[in-house]
């Protein structure tokens, strides 16, 4: 928004642009929303709103995310709206705190660890950071990761991604759509499988297949039992991957792209033994995983290409200089 300034930095009658910002002290997670036209204006409001004693000035403003010192008005104007700042008094130092994934809470002796930063809380934050670095990674995430982001509190996810709650709500809606699309594909495949099974029963193909499987099983028991046991120990897939392959319908839709790649590289015979499947079923699932992986990679490459084209059209004449970093507390 724009208002006419009557005091401070701008002269009388001069139009100034106010940037909405979020401020907090180093000892509190309570933050305040302010609007400032420049850094000096933001420092002044920080002293007033956060009750910083004048004897502790000058106040240093750093980005709450990584401790970058913001002391240049041009850089300040380039920051997005609702950027989070930490106001440091003259006797305070910023310190990176890994427990909250770089949200940059300042270290204090009386700091209480947030319970949501442990266990599942850390896991969804790690996934959120991956999404923050590259939005197209949505395509590569597993259903479990997608569901964690959908279930994450909107305000916490907005803070982690440095976006507004409205933007994050739209993102969570998109993530839910991705989950719904995968479920629709899974149900379609299930219906197709049921249809094929009905055809097999109708044509007496199923009984012949069972006889063939029984004969094959007896031969394996008589000849290759020792080899099969030895082969099963060679499977390097994690337990959650094997569980998904055994229990999920269309398991390729449940796994992340990294897991899909591991499945496609696994030896079919060893995987068949580990899953207690026949070779044909194992190879069919591996082929489905390979197709799903290729589709996701193709979609990701397409997004990257579109992003590169958009960036080249809207690239600024020059890059910002590397900002300085606040020195970290050695403790």
Curated annotation (Swiss-Prot):
GO terms for biological process: apoptotic DNA fragmentation; chaperone-mediated protein folding; negative regulation of apoptotic DNA fragmentation; negative regulation of deoxyribonuclease activity; negative regulation of execution phase of apoptosis; positive regulation of apoptotic process; thymocyte apoptotic process. GO terms for molecular function: deoxyribonuclease inhibitor activity; protein domain specific binding; protein folding chaperone. The modification N-acetylmethionine is found at residue 1. The modification Phosphoserine is found at residue 315. Signal peptide: none annotated. Caspase-3 cleaves DFF45 at 2 sites to generate an active factor. Pfam families: CIDE-N, DFF-C. This is DNA fragmentation factor subunit alpha. The modification Phosphothreonine is found at residue 243. Residues 17-96 form the CIDE-N domain. Residues 305-331 are annotated as: Disordered. GO terms for cellular component: chromatin; cytosol; nucleoplasm; nucleus; plasma membrane; protein-containing complex. Keywords: Acetylation, Apoptosis, Cytoplasm, Phosphoprotein. The lineage of its organism: Eukaryota, Metazoa, Chordata, Craniata, Vertebrata. InterPro entries: CIDE-N_dom, DFF-C, DFF45, DNA_fragmentation_mid_dom. Its main location: cytoplasm. Heterodimer of DFFA and DFFB. The record marks 117-118, 224-225 as: Cleavage. It is found in: Cytoplasm.
């Amino acid at each position: 928004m724009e208002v006419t300034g009557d005091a401070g930095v701008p002269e009388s009658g001069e139009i100034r642009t106010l940037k909405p910002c979020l401020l907090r002290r180093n000892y509190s997670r309570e933050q305040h929303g302010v609007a400032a036209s420049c850094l000096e204006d933001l420092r002044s409001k920080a002293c007033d709103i956060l009750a910083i004693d004048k004897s502790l000035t000058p106040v240093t403003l750093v980005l709450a995310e990584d401790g970058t010192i913001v002391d240049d008005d041009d850089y300040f104007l380039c920051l997005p709206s609702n950027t989070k700042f930490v106001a440091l008094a003259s006797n305070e130092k910023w310190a990176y705190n890994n427990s909250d994934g770089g949200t940059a809470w300042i270290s204090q002796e009386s700091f209480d660890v947030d319970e949501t930063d442990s266990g599942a809380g850390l896991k969804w934050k790690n996934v959120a950071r991956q999404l923050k670095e590259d939005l197209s990674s949505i395509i590569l995430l597993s259903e479990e990761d997608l569901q964690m982001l959908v279930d994450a509190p909107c305000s916490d996810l907005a803070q982690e991604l440095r976006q507004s709650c409205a933007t994050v709500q739209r993102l969570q809606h998109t993530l839910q759509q991705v989950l719904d699309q995968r479920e629709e594909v899974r149900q379609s495949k299930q219906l197709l499988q049921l249809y094929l099974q009905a055809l097999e029963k109708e044509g007496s193909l199923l009984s012949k297949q069972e006889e063939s499987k029984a004969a094959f099983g007896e031969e394996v028991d008589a000849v290759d039992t020792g080899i099969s046991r030895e082969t099963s120990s060679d499977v390097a897939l994690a337990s959650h991957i094997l569980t998904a392959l055994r229990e999920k319908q269309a398991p390729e839709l449940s796994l992340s792209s990294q897991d899909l790649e591991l499945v496609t590289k696994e030896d079919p015979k060893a995987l068949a033994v580990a899953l207690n499947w026949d070779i044909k079923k194992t190879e069919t699932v591996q082929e489905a995983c390979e197709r799903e992986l290729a589709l996701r990679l193709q979609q990701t490459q397409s997004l990257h290409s579109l992003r590169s084209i958009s960036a080249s059209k809207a690239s600024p004449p020059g890059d910002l200089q590397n900002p300085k970093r606040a020195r970290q507390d050695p403790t």
